[in-house]
A protein has these predicted regions:
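Anionic-ligand binding patches
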Residues: 119
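Extended, subdomain-level signal for the structured scaffold at the beginning of enzyme domains
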Residues: 1-97, 107-116, 126-136, 141-181
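Short, thiol/selenol-centered motifs that function as redox-active sites or metal-ligating centers
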Residues: 101-102
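Catalytic cores of processing enzymes, dominated by hydrolases/peptidases
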Residues: 122
Length: 181
């Protein structure tokens, strides 16, 4: 299961665009609310979450990928929540992927998870990518870590998530189907 962890103040495009692309790829993707079953984005869009973070933690369900959207104060809310640490721990035990965009890569960076990796984030938040090599482009994938610079990279970020969980062919077909190429 792909868990897109939303917190109040998340960046709408960074959560919804990858969700849409992952659904098109036939993946089991769900919004997981940090604080409740509904979370409000910084742009005013509220998502209905399949479950709360606490419910996912209690379920024992396998997490194939944990996706953290950026936006403020959403990314800060994720960074400060103990539930985020527990979901990181579960994802690690499952051998899953860790993905984050915009300000949210700081969550992994501040926990030392990006040391020795190539990663990116919104320019003002790159200082939190402790020990990482900053990528040249807007999307970086290094092993089980996928990061992106911001809202403008949300589509390419979503395609990279598909490449990680499925393959290049599936990502390319979806890109063509939505008239991106």
């Amino acid at each position: 299961m792909v868990a897109i962890l939303t917190a109040n103040g998340y960046e709408c495009v960074e959560a919804i665009c990858p969700f849409n692309l992952l659904k098109r790829a036939g993946l089991d993707v769900r919004f997981v609310g940090l604080n409740g079953k509904t979370e409000s984005g910084s742009c005013g869009v509220t998502v209905e979450c399949a479950m709360t973070a606490a419910e996912l933690i209690e379920s024992g369900e396998k997490i194939d990928m944990l996706v953290l959207p950026g936006g403020l104060p959403g990314a800060t809310n994720l960074d400060e929540a103990p539930e985020t640490d527990k979901l990181i721990e579960i994802t690690e035990k499952c051998g899953g992927f860790f993905a984050a965009i915009c300000a949210a890569p700081m969550v992994y960076g501040k926990r030392g998870m990006l040391k020795g990796k190539t990663a990116t984030a919104y320019p003002e938040f790159r200082k939190y990518l402790d020990g990482a090599t900053i990528a040249e482009g807007n999307v970086a994938r290094d092993g089980r870590f996928i990061t992106a610079a911001g809202m403008g990279a949300a589509f390419d970020f979503g395609l990279e998530l598909i490449r990680a969980l499925k393959d290049d062919e599936t990502a390319d077909k979806i890109s063509a189907a939505v008239c991106a190429k």
